Swiss-Prot record:
Organism, as annotated: Myrmecia gulosa (Red bulldog ant)
Gene Ontology MF annotations: toxin activity
GO biological process terms held by the UniProt record: defense response to bacterium; killing of cells of another organism
Compartments (UniProt record): Secreted; Target cell membrane
The family this protein is said to belong to: Belongs to the formicidae venom precursor-01 superfamily.
Functional note: Toxin that may interact with target cell membranes, producing a concentration-dependent leak in ion conductance, possibly via multimeric pore formation. It produces an immediate sharp increase of calcium concentration in all DRG neurons. This influx in calcium stabilizes without resulting in any observable dye leakage, showing that the effect is not simply cytolytic. This toxin may be one of the major contributors to the pain associated with envenomation. The toxin also displays a weak cytotoxicity (on HEK cells) and some antimicrobial activity (MIC=2.5 uM on C.neoformans (var.
Sorted UniProt keywords: Amidation, Antibiotic, Antimicrobial, Cytolysis, Membrane, Secreted, Signal, Target cell membrane, Target membrane, Toxin
Residues with the Leucine amide modification: 85
Listed name of the protein: U-myrmeciitoxin(01)-Mg1a
Pfam families cross-referenced by the UniProt entry: Pilosulin
Length: 86
């Protein structure tokens, strides 16, 4: 049952990430038949902030998932030990 909650949580986070992702459009800065001389303009701030937040979010999810997995493994080991002894 806990695995179902984990999968549901990951699915919700995935959908929210897609919904709140910044929209990106390619815009021509010059005439397509102009010379090869030009300049490049980049806006890396938006991508860097979005990626950093996503990394923290994935880190938190990974910690929770590891905690849940550790609890499940401990419970399974305790049940096996109880079966072996009793």
């Amino acid at each position: 049952m806990k695995l179902l909650y984990l999968l549901l949580t990951l699915a919700i986070i995935f959908v929210l990430t897609i919904v709140h992702a910044p929209n990106v459009e390619a815009k021509a800065l010059a005439d397509p038949e102009s010379d090869a001389v030009g300049f490049a303009d980049a806006f890396g701030d938006a991508d860097a902030e979005a990626t950093g937040g996503l990394g923290r979010l994935i880190g938190k999810i990974a910690k929770k998932g590891a905690k849940i997995a550790a609890e499940a493994a401990a419970n399974a080991a305790a049940e096996k030990a109880a079966e072996a002894l009793g």
